[in-house]
Amino acid sequence: MQVKTIRMLRLAASVLAGLLGCAAWAQTAPEPVNPNATPEARALLAYLNSISGNAIVTGQHNYPNDGARWTNLAHDLTGKYPGLFGQDFGFSAGDDKDSVLSRPAMIEEVKRQYANGAIVTLTWHEVRPTDDEPVTFHESVQGHLTDSEWQQLLTPGTPLYIRWCSQVDVVAGYLRQLRDAHVPVLFRAYHEMNGSWFWWGGRPGKDGSAALYRQIYDRFVNVHHLDNLVWVWNVNAPGGSAGPIADYYPGPQYADLVTMDIYSEFKQQFYTSMVELAAGKPIALAEVGKLPTPEVLEQQPRWTYFMTWSEWIQTANTLDQANAVYHALRSLNRDDPRLAVPMEAIRKATASRTGVRVSGSNSQ
């Protein structure tokens, strides 16, 4: 047996032992910010914490109406399925209408991907609460709220707050389907909030973008009881119109993971700032354009996953670059036993506890 395979199996065995109840391992696992988090959500967070510093899960984003198109392309390019499957509740390019009609099919694809062994992460390019869907992406998602509208949005009982609740409640219904199917989700709310290109972003301070993040956390956790969510806080790499990251942090009691989007240069200062702000929580590259090299991953070992943005896997990277990171020893693809064994353990534990069997399918 090759040395690489032996090393992979040894690490998989140690991670599985932890998932099955190793006391020492459990003591080092972070407590979810939601005290009522499901066993699956807790296990997923504990797994990500366990690989921090040792390995990184490969990931790929997909547009709502694309199913698993870009995940399948990553496989075609590298021969490996990404370990993390990313989807979106609302993203359309240019003047196309928002992809709200794709949500039911997207949820079914998420279930299939999880059953086949992938970690699931979901993003939401939410339209302004002043707008009714469907609308165009540029007009609404990249629109603007006045300061007065922003204050109304954060004030319970106002017409704009009520509209926002109605909008959020629709997406909560889809997330509830995943909760009831025992699918844990890395949920990335109001991403890139330190940037000025989305209506929710570019507002630093306690009453700014972070306050809206806390508001959706409260509604999803305390009203809808979406206890399958692992809460992912996210910023863009600082520079240009993206402000200092600490000005947007909602507080450690609202974030299970601390993540950054980097589309070009993986500066060491970005990594260091995330490690410091996370204060022991797992960190990740929630979006990348250009893939990190194996050398970058060795120098920045605490990233727990990366997610390439849809077509960028091909348009911003050469075939050699994609294969270099997907076949790096540190990288965990879907079939890697260091990922596949723990994910199977989580699904089997669900079946044992609830009688609900989450099994793989022929769909990729």
What is the predicted function of each stretch?
Residues 94-222, 226:
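Substrate-binding cleft of extracellular glycoside hydrolase catalytic domains
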Residues 42-44, 66-76, 104-108, 170-174, ...:
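Alpha-helical scaffolding within the catalytic cores
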Residues 12-23:
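Bacterial N-terminal signal peptides
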